[in-house]
Every structure is written in structure tokens, then in C-alpha cells.
Amino acid sequence: MINKTLNFTGLIFIILLFLYTSINYNSLPEKVPVHFDLYSNPDAWGYKKEIFILPIIILALWIFMYLLFKYYVKFENFKSTFENKTISKDAINFNRRFITILNFELSTLLSFMGIKDVYNATGGNIDIGIFQFVIILVVIFSTIILHLYKCYKHKYF
């Protein structure tokens, strides 16, 4: 149940990003920042149509991660036929949960980043500087490290 909730919630954030970007599209200037340095200062500008690149990338990433979640069992079964070993059902569920959590974190964090970019392009001012980069790295890598630790602890390798 938690997997479905997290997957659905991540998709909702992406849809909200598309809606927010579409609603504010007409109020965007012709040139908008499309790339930022480490401190969130714009270092590349593009046409306002390019503001949809980030939501499209986030949606493609979400679809890829969701398909990986959905077909993980088939992938594991295919892999185990070549390695002559089976993976436990607990390990499969644990890894599927990890994929779901990572998908949720990525879609949520990147959607908020996209909303911030649109808001700033329309004249707003949300400046969290390097903390945006740090937050994303800490959340993603702490999830990965925690997953690897639990895999090692439960001998899921």
C-alpha cells in the first residue's frame, strides 16, 4: 500500500509542476534562466518554452523508475536464471520499496525545484542558494546508504 501511495504522490507533484508552469507560462518573460550554478545563480538563459524541459525530464525519470518498480520481479527472475541463485521474496519487496522511495524523493525534490524556478522567473524571489543542492544530495545519498546498510545487515546481496 505504501508503494502505491508514494508512487501516486510523486506523480501528483509532477502534475502540479506541469499545471503551475502552464498557468504561469503567459506571465513569464521571453528569456528565462534555464541553468544555474552551484549557488543557484543563473548562468544560462533560454526561451520561455524551455521552462518545460525540467518537468518533461522529471516525468521521464518517474516513468522509468515506476517501470523498474513494476517489473522488478521479472527482472530479478531473469537475472537469477543466469546466476543460478534465487532471491528471497523479502529482498525483492525490500528493493522494490527502495525504488519507490527513491522515485518519490526525486520527483518531489525536483518538482519543488521546478516550481521555484518558475516562481523566480515570474519575478518572485526564493533564494536558497547552495542549500538546494545540499538538500538533494543529502536526501538521495542518505537513502542509498541506508538501503545498502540494510541490505548488508539482512544479507540481501
What positions do the PLM features span?
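Alpha-helical transmembrane segments and their helix-start/interface "positive-inside/aromatic belt" motifs
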Residues: 1-14, 51-55, 96
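Select subsegments of transmembrane alpha-helices in polytopic membrane proteins
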Residues: 6-7, 66-68, 95-108
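Alpha-helical transmembrane segments
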Residues: 12-13, 46-65, 132-140
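Active-site and channel-lining beta-strand-loop segments
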Residues: 21-52
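Membrane-water interface of transmembrane alpha-helices
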Residues: 24-27, 62-81, 147-154
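Short membrane-interface loop/juxtamembrane segments of multi-pass integral membrane proteins
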Residues: 81-95
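Alpha-helical transmembrane segments and their membrane-interface junctions
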Residues: 104-123
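Terminal transmembrane helical module of multi-pass membrane proteins
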Residues: 127-157
